[in-house]
Amino acid sequence: MKRTFAEAMAHRRSYYSIGSDSPVLDEEIVHIIREAVKNVPSAFNSQSTRIVLLLGDEHKKLWNIVKETLKARISAEAFAKTEAKIDGCFASGHGTVLYFEDTSVVKKLQETFPSYKDNFPTWSQHTSAMHQFAIWTMLELSLI
């Protein structure tokens, strides 16, 4: 029996011990992300959220870049712990979802509606948070 959205929300958790096998087909992940981008509301219908889904080699490449960058910036002792965390909790996964806010959209709204200009950056972050919440909850729903 399928969970309701409320049940999926209550059950949703961060998973840290992850593997490269996904219980959700890649096509379903793409569909979930597209539905969120299309349907999650945003202030002034700004639709400023941008999402990148990395799978396969692109996912691995990202986490190698992260490790190389951190290795150059932190001590060897700290890096060993960090590398273990990255390898066991992030790079070992099936894919990565990256969330961005298009600042050109925010700037355009600030110019168009100067009375609200100080609010648009915050509203943009609210929109990003709603996208993240919607996507992770829909992914939780699809696990059943």
Task: Give the role of each language-model region.
Residues G93-D102, V106:
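Conserved active-site beta-strand-loop modules that form the wall/rim of enzyme catalytic pockets
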Residues I74, S104-V105, L109:
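Membrane-helix exit/interface motif
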Residues Y15-Y16, Y99, Y116:
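Sequence-level detector for tyrosine residue identity
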Residues W63-I65, K107-T112:
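Short, conserved acidic/polar surface loops in the N-terminal third of protein domains
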Residues V37, T103, F113-I144:
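Small-aliphatic-rich amphipathic alpha-helix that forms the alpha element of a beta-alpha
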Residues M1-G95:
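N-terminal amphipathic, basic helical "cap/leader" segment at the start of enzyme domains
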